């Protein structure tokens, strides 16, 4: 049989996902279109879509499309279609109309016109006609109006495909089965299931998400439970082809059930659990998923479940008329996820992005969907501490705090007090106030002040010898106390986890909020971002290095290599540099540097921003340009698709410094810095130069407890150092 063009309808905003699914099913030319997706193939392909599509509402086989001069042409247009090729006089049919037709205000008018045309054609051919059965017809005819165009199709589905056959009608506030499947697909459940991950719904309701998750994980065709489809009453139905598809689906089901992993659904309502178990049995999955009455606060992973997906459709304002404070419900859900499901992924389906913020988690992806007429968002999360950014735990009552928590609070308060006079004298607005002073509370805490006060907390990853539960408890104590001691709202406290970084991991984007805040340093203005990256855009330990650069820059040609957000360039320019050149591989950070320059009124051709691999750029500039002052602050280790090879600062620093010194004017200075704690400078390899260690002089007071936070040297050509020692240059007094 020749190929046909089929149309698969889908819930709003799911056309692209449906097209992807149809492509995976082997459908030719699957493409999103208005209201769903189109594909081509044989009748057997239409059957396959009915059997296997988890997302489609209906599979339609178009018969004709006509342009109408007016509503009175509907009857004659329908009369021309050979309905006898699809229906016999002793069978029944029903007609459904969607869309809008010019001149037709009541869809029932179009339905009656087509019904009469079918009756007239059959009466003319056979002297009798098929009857109309709106509830259980042998054949469903679908009409779609679009202005003056009317399309006629056969509905191969019969009942909507979301009706799998396992759920009772009338369940309270149902999530339709195909929407539930779409949520699971968007959340990455097929990949998680393939890797042996678990699925858990802490508010499972009638169990739809868990059952659809089981069908996906076990490779069970969603239409396998249905006894009847729309094509069964069609005169051209190919029963052998249908039986072949069923046989294949049954074999795949048998194989898939053998690899089905952990599936758990919890709900506080015992009736919901009973309904879920009933639906599970009707789906032929009795005993293969676990449903249990549990409060949200009692929700835990299964004992054997190390990772997986938590997916949930919490109540929202329009749903069920829930009386509970939904903000508190979302906050409790977020706390459960952060405390018990670290390493998992999560997906929350909500009608309110504002409620989603109460979770205290930064979404990695957001999809727009509809639950019936209600516009919703599917928020996808990775449950990792680096995504915990707000809504911190409330401080534990004094009677519940451990002695260690009290010591932590006291130390934080004392540190802040001890630094107060120094801050006021030097005008320091951004500083480190705690750096793992108590080993049990392995945190670095930085205070930023601008139009508001913010706290940036970095947790040092605990070694394997530390009990993860104890570490989480201490973190929770600390996060509860920080807002109290520092008098900062919880939403202005941001948490990151500091692990040993590989490649450019410390510069990789964590989120895309685009929220920047202005802070100041020695009268200069900088933009910081607490959410999107591991670091904020302002390295506080280099504060005195930047001030030194500013003091040495008057009239100088300044070069900033591995420039990050260009803060050193701002100091140089405001210190009177004749020109500045800022080089970094990242377009993102160069744009950030440009904003910092603009914020301080620095603009013009004398201030260049160059996106380039710094090592290649240094080599390319040899013999072409010279600079009087160079700041070289490379990462400890780096690799990038756009970078030539890798950079290991311990291994490569001599070569890099030698190459950079070729760009340094006689009499100039190279300031070389890095943050590798175990770094050892190779003085023998740098013997041709004068090397002065200024690490101690450039260590800010707030970092005194951690003297190895950075290493810093001034490197000069020998004649430059000799001249300065003889007093020919008085700039050394600034160092």
UniProtKB/Swiss-Prot annotation:
Pfam families in the record: Methyltrans_SAM (PF10672), RlmL_1st (PF22020), THUMP (PF02926), UPF0020 (PF01170)
One GO MF term: RNA binding
Location relative to the cell: Cytoplasm
Intrachain S-S bonds: none
Primary site of residence: cytoplasm
Known EC number: 2.1.1.173, 2.1.1.264
Swiss-Prot/TrEMBL keywords: Cytoplasm, Methyltransferase, RNA-binding, rRNA processing, S-adenosyl-L-methionine, Transferase
InterPro entries according to UniProt: 23SrRNA_methyltr_KL, DNA_methylase_N6_adenine_CS, RlmKL-like_Mtase, RlmKL-like_Mtase_CS, RlmL_1st, SAM-dep_methyl-trfase, SAM-dependent_MTases_sf, THUMP_dom
Assigned GO CC terms: cytoplasm
Catalytic activity: guanosine(2445) in 23S rRNA + S-adenosyl-L-methionine = N(2)-methylguanosine(2445) in 23S rRNA + S-adenosyl-L-homocysteine + H(+); guanosine(2069) in 23S rRNA + S-adenosyl-L-methionine = N(2)-methylguanosine(2069) in 23S rRNA + S-adenosyl-L-homocysteine + H(+)
UniProt domain THUMP: residue ranges: 45-156
Domain of life: Bacteria
Role noted for this protein: Specifically methylates the guanine in position 2445 (m2G2445) and the guanine in position 2069 (m7G2069) of 23S rRNA.
Family: Belongs to the methyltransferase superfamily. RlmKL family.
Protein name stated in the entry: Ribosomal RNA large subunit methyltransferase K/L
Taxonomy of the source species: Bacteria, Pseudomonadati, Pseudomonadota, Gammaproteobacteria, Chromatiales
Protein's gene: rlmL
